[in-house]
UniProtKB/Swiss-Prot annotation:
NCBIfam families: lipA, PRK05481.1, PRK12928.1. GO terms for molecular function: 4 iron, 4 sulfur cluster binding; lipoate synthase activity; metal ion binding. This is Lipoyl synthase. The keyword S-adenosyl-L-methionine applies. [4Fe-4S] cluster 1 binds at residues 61, 66, 72, 300. Pfam families: Radical_SAM. Belongs to the radical SAM superfamily. Lipoyl synthase family. The gene is lipA. Its main location: cytoplasm. The keyword Nuclease does not apply. The lineage of its organism: Bacteria, Pseudomonadati, Pseudomonadota, Alphaproteobacteria, Acetobacterales. Keywords: 4Fe-4S, Cytoplasm, Iron, Iron-sulfur, Metal-binding, S-adenosyl-L-methionine, Transferase. Pathway: Protein modification; protein lipoylation via endogenous pathway; protein N(6)-(lipoyl)lysine from octanoyl-[acyl-carrier-protein]: step 2/2. InterPro entries: Aldolase_TIM (IPR013785), Elp3/MiaA/NifB-like_rSAM (IPR006638), Lipoyl_synth (IPR003698), rSAM (IPR007197). It comes from Acidiphilium cryptum (strain JF-5).
Amino acid sequence: MRVEIDHRNSGGGKLRHPEKQHRPDNPIQRKPAWIRVKAPNHPVYHETRALMREAKLVTVCEEAACPNIGECWSQRHATMMIMGEICTRACAFCNVTTGQPAPLAADEPARVAEAVARLGLQHVVITSVDRDDLDDGGAAHFAAVIGAIRAAAPSTTIEILTPDFLRKPGALEVVVAARPDVFNHNLETVPRLYPSIRPGARYYQSLRLLDRVKQLDPSIFTKSGLMAGLGEDRGEVGQVMDDLRIADVDFLTIGQYLQPTVKHAAVDRFVTPDEFADLAAMARAKGFLMVSATPLTRSSYHADADFAALREARAARHAA
């Protein structure tokens, strides 16, 4: 069975992506066998889902219609999305709702921390929508969430996946000062495709953000991700890898882009598992500490095991 994507908001019947309704339809291609997944039905999946509902937390697993939700939630792994479920950007690839966000919930850091403690997570991934409406882009809220998790679950390692904080001076410094264990910011695609795929962002702003994290605190692991199958070529991907290595990024993820609705960017092609293996080999040769490149790779997929391997890889490199 395939996981079906909810294209509408629950209740009210409003379109989830009204800003995309003027765009022509892009038919959704049938997925090849190597990226089809079973519908989630494990008892622990339902327990995790119930806990998220009870704590009134949003997850990127649901909002972005992640194909790995069944596997991850069955292991009590969920990526929590803070600062609401409404994003101020309208990226052509993303299934998160676009619109005017609600004010920040002051109790959200405590609710996130409680959920992390109850799930007994060794490693947690926290992401967010873009909040261009806030003076600091939500930086102080990120810091508050990190602090609350440290207090409630001191042994849990924390990975954050942040927006670009475009035109938010001082915001990055606030987040880095909270000392997450991993700072992830996805470049998403190659520079040539930014105008059509990520129009609200700037490639070199994202690259500078990652570079600046390492300048501020070299002990923090940095991570970035790319989508494959949007029309990029191998040479362009190699150049992005080089840019990331110049910025001293430790961990690269590459996964297949999957089109959420007919109003989103079309899949240019489905990249084969062998091609992903080739990209992984190329990335390792360029010096990344860790690489995950498979059709179903997503930013937080297997993040707990990957973090343990990342620490071991750094220790081995320093010992060499």
